[in-house]
């Protein structure tokens, strides 16, 4: 990932970061809201009407980063219900989204749509998404990693790692896979990074710190949960860590 001089991690609140990169989240609000309705809620007994909940800021941030670097390709580890991939696919310059998960595409899971419990597969969710841009997305299962290494080597502009958060070896292997698939100017985005100043719940922070100590990267911690929605719960010292071979701001 390049040979730029190592920098101290810069920390930004979400709205501050959006101002720096000239991104207006409201222009994407209607579309991403529709995606979040289907893919971002958990069962809530008290919820009678959909609203953008705490943490729904993430897809805006991922899409904004894709826009910032003029990305044409996006690789994701940890599909979940596809929130990130569907949102990034809406970016005009994006031509390819590849998303990898340990759960088969056809396997039904207990989840929620608009806070209401439902058992549904990723394949069935995909059919509910109305945006034509979803055709850009290719879904892969973990057993297809050798295929990805062979046919997608150095193909991606962004790797978004949002898979296992607790097993250090799995996270390290996710980094290795991402580096294989990224081109020389590609950036990595780590979800659920917690700074050393916080009470870390996940292994992500320690693994990323070790990775940063070995390389010559620019890094940015962007705090986002509760920064647009449910602002009374605004989170600090945690968010996504963006690692880049060049300066983003």
Question: What are these model-derived regions, one by one?
Answer:
Residues 23-69:
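Class I SAM-dependent methyltransferase Rossmann-like catalytic core
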């Amino acid at each position: 990932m390049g040979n730029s001089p190592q920098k101290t991690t810069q920390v930004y609140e979400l709205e501050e970061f959006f101002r720096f990169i000239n991104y207006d989240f409201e222009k994407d609000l209607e579309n991403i809201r529709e995606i979040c309705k289907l893919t971002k809620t958990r069962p809530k007994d008290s919820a009678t009407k959909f609203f953008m909940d705490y943490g729904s800021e993430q897809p805006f941030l991922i899409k904004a980063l894709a826009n910032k670097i003029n990305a044409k390709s996006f690789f994701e580890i940890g599909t979940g219900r596809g929130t990130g991939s569907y949102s990034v696919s809406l970016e005009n310059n994006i031509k390819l989204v590849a998303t990898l998960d340990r759960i088969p595409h056809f396997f039904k899971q207990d989840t929620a749509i608009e806070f209401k419990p439902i058992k549904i597969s990723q394949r069935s969710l995909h059919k509910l998404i109305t945006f034509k841009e979803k055709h850009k997305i290719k879904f892969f299962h973990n057993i297809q990693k050798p295929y990805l290494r062979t046919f997608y080597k150095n193909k991606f502009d962004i790797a978004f790692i949002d898979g296992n958060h607790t097993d250090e070896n799995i996270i390290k292997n996710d980094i290795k896979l991402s580096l294989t698939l990224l081109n020389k100017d590609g950036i990595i985005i780590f979800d659920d990074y917690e700074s050393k100043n916080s009470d870390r719940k996940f292994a992500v922070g320690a693994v990323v710190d070790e990775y940063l100590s070995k390389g010559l990267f620019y890094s940015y911690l962007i705090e986002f949960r509760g920064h647009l929605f449910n602002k009374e719960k605004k989170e600090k010292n945690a968010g996504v860590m963006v690692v880049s071979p060049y300066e983003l701001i």
